[in-house]
Amino acid sequence: YTTAIEQLSSDKASIRLGGVYTLVGLVDEWLADDKTIPNIEERRKEGQVIINNLCAYIRSPFLLAERTKQLDAPYAKDLQKNFGGDIEKFNEDKQYFAQEKAALEEERQVRQSIIKEMREHLSKNYSKSGPWSDFDYDFSDAHFFYPVNFNDSYFGTSIVNFSGATFTQADF
């Protein structure tokens, strides 16, 4: 558990994703493990701790998100005039732009993976509720700079908090 939480703070997206999938697996294991923890409420409490961490990750600020519109656009060749014809400075800026664009996309993928896993555990292949339908989800003040899809999700007795959240793209 501790290692997976630490992975969420890695500068490498692949390691952060590994942490996400490890945590998702741990929630599922705890919910299913009625031998070690016979009481379902105790198992849910353990799972809720991980859900809280995943929601905290979603809520955490990501500075490049403020530049989503700019970074989603292609790098304009006409910006070369801003560098007084200095090709070297133009190329440096273009490379920096590409690095930031890649970092934004990687972070989108990590956050979208968390939302996708939540959605699948809330609905997919379940007639009413999914195994995560009774957890609480706190997305307050989150900035969703990526598509969010909770279609067909069943939150059961959950408290779901989106207060203060901003959405660039969402489908409920």
Where on the chain are the PLM-derived regions?
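Tandem repeat scaffolds
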Residues: 128-172
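N-terminal capping/linker segments that flank leucine-rich repeat
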Residues: 1-137
